[in-house]
Amino acid sequence: MEHGSYEHSCGCVPGKGTDGARKVIKRWVVNDPKGTSKVAVLDVKQCYPTLPHEQLRLKLEKRIKDRKFLRLAFKIIASYQQAMANKTQLLPETIAVGIPVGLYTSPWFLNFFFQDLDHLIAEKCGLSHLVRYVDDMVLFDNSKKRLHAAIRTVGDYLQHMQMRLKSTWQVYHLRIRPLDFLGFKFHANGKITLRKSILYRISRKARTIARKGYASVTNASGMISYKGYMDHSDSSGFYEKWVQPFINFKVLKGVVSNENRKQCKALCAA
């Protein structure tokens, strides 16, 4: 399903993900400041609940010829529709919509479904700087006119697929306002910071652990995840002031490691 996918489609793709999106955006902003001077941020409205089954099946049949794979994929697609979540009458598969959030195959189906859209933006709209994370898209260019044309193209494509673009899309100058994407803020000078809400949650969790004198598995694993955010952004000043005095990450890793060993022993005993 990855064959033919757009290079910078990063959501839930092994080796890419959030870190892959962060790296490529920073590289573009630093190496091509003119070509990334304007940015468009947009996403699909209720992407998972509105994905049309018939269109997804047609795309799979067109690209993949392995009948065994297709039979399995079609069974997975038909096993759920949004009417189940809404507790309403089930629809015929030809007009059914929706794939379940959290199912392993769902982000793969979404990434595959939007492959054509990725190439359409790059080829028809002439934009070379596009990152998509599942249903969230970021487009860069030096022309607001081209970005608005690309947004219209995306909207028309989604309408053809019986889906919709959220009305909250934005186009703006990167030097005036940083790009807020995936928890990071990308500045025109190449600097990467974290959202204030994330910084607040990090400092609050650090103080909570310090006040209690111990860390639960949940708090320990959460704090370790936040450490990854700080390591991949320009947050050294924040870390030194609000985290380092309160947290010993070796101890937190020990807490998580001990819990993993307990779970492994329990599984082996069963």
Which residues fall in each region the model found?
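Short glycine-rich loop/turn motifs that provide flexible caps or phosphate-binding loops at active sites
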Residues: 10, 14, 97, 101, ...
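Conserved polymerase palm-domain catalytic core
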Residues: 26-134, 138-153, 173, 229, ...
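Long, hydrophobic, well-ordered secondary-structure blocks that form the structural core
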Residues: 11-22, 41
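Electropositive, glycine- and tryptophan-enriched low-complexity nucleic-acid-binding patches
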Residues: 1-10
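Right-hand nucleic-acid polymerase module
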Residues: 88-96, 148-155, 165-270
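A common structural junction motif
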Residues: 64, 155-163
